[in-house]
Amino acid sequence: MLLIKNNPFRILGISLFDSEKEIQKKITKITRFTEVGKEVSFDLDLVKLFEIDRNLENINNSKRKIEKPLTKVLHSLFWFYQSNHVDEIGFENLSNGDIDKTIQIWEKVVKDREVTTKNFSTLSNLKTLYYIKYNVNGFDKDSFTRYLELTGKFFSNEEFEKYSKKIINSDNTNITNFEITKTFIDQILLEIKPFIDKENGITYSEIINSLNFFSTELNDYVSFKTTSTPTNNIEVRINETSE
């Protein structure tokens, strides 16, 4: 859950698509406030869900996490952004700590509907919220499998490439969608390792069955990863690439 609690976009109070100039302006502001012992808050702090600690160490760590294009995109996958009225309504409920109500609102927009530019943000927000839900009180398999389904739709949609380029603030990047999804799935497999083949947990077969919306290449990678490494020697890629 630290990918949510200490998400650099949350700690720094920046939106996913802020320009470098806007990012530096906000970093300067919160650094100065913190140095003199003043608190600063932002709309998406979501303190009813998790406490937030904007000490200088967390601020500096967060700055490093978004310096590289790949890790900036990866950390964005564990945060939110607002792009339409339905997002706004959801965030009003989420700011009050009501996860289930927010899911209900966003599911109406995403479930069985075509994902377009207009509701892509809601899909992104909903999958992030399911990440929180499956983690918040131990492991919840139904929420986890729904999270994978939504994330697969998110990655496979043509809007994702536009999204990642906008995060990086550049059309010129050598980062491939497969590199992003592969690094992402490594992190998820590592996180759920304690629940594999456990009571009230999940099996690798159930995980693979939830990857229908991911690319064939990613499915092949997960199948290889989960069958050829029974000891689950999976790297922590998100944190490693931040260094």
Residues covered by each model-derived region:
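N-terminal J-domain/J-like co-chaperone modules of DnaJ/Hsp40 proteins
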Residues: 1-48, 58, 71-74
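Conserved "turn/edge" positions that cap or connect secondary-structure elements
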Residues: 9-12, 49-52, 72-85, 89-91
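Amphipathic alpha-helical protein-interaction segments
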Residues: 24-31, 58, 62, 82-243
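Residue-level detector of alpha-helical recognition elements and their boundaries
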Residues: 41-42, 77-78, 117
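Long, intrinsically disordered, low-complexity Ser/Thr/Pro-rich regulatory/activation regions
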Residues: 62-72
